[in-house]
Amino acid sequence: MSPRDYWYAAGHYSASEHGGTHIDAPIHFSRGGLTVDQIPLAKLIAPTVVIDISEACNKNRDYRLSVDDLTTWEKQHGQIPDGSLVLARTGWGKYWPDKGHYLGSDVPGDINVLHFPGFSLEAARFLVTRRKIIGVGIDTASMDYGPSRLFEVHGIILGAGLYGLENIAHLDSLPPTAATIVALPMRIKGGSGAPTRIIAVLP
C-alpha cells in the first residue's frame, strides 16, 4: 500500500426490536408504558436471582416456572431481595441455534406449533404483587411459554412497569445469587424493545 492508501470497512445493519437477545420495554404490552430509551440506567444494573428449572424443563418442554419454584428457591437462599432481576434458567440455551429444538418448530411464522418453557401466570403475579423486583429474564424466546396465545405474563410484568430480557445466553454459568447483570440495550427512541448486550459481573 502507498502512503495514501488505507483500509476501510463498513456494513449495513437492520434487526427486529424483539429478535436475538433483547429487552422488552413496558410499552411492548402496556399502552402508555415506558419505551426502551426511557428505562432508567439504574434499573439496567441489578443483582440477579437465578431460578434453576432446567430439570423440570427437560421432562416437559412446556414447563412454566411456578410459585413453588420461587418459594423453594427462597427457602434455600432467603427472600428475593428488593430491586432484583429474576432470571429463569431453563437450560434451553443448549438448543441454540437449532430452531426446531429451541422453538419447538423450524416452520417460519407458525406460532401454533411453538413449544418452550416460560414463566407461569401465577409466578408473574407473585413477583409483581409480593416482591419488589425490577424485571425478569429467561433463556428462551419469550417469558410466556411457547403455546401461549394471550401473552399474559408479558401483560403482568410489563403492565407493572417492569422489563423483560429474552433469549439470554449462558445462564448456566451464573450462580443462584451474587451476580450483577448489566443490560445494555440499543437506545432506540420510542422503541418497544431493543437488541441488548448483557454482561454478568461475578463476585
Q: What role is predicted for each listed range?
A:
Residues M1-P203:
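Active-/binding-site microenvironments in catalytic and ligand-binding cores
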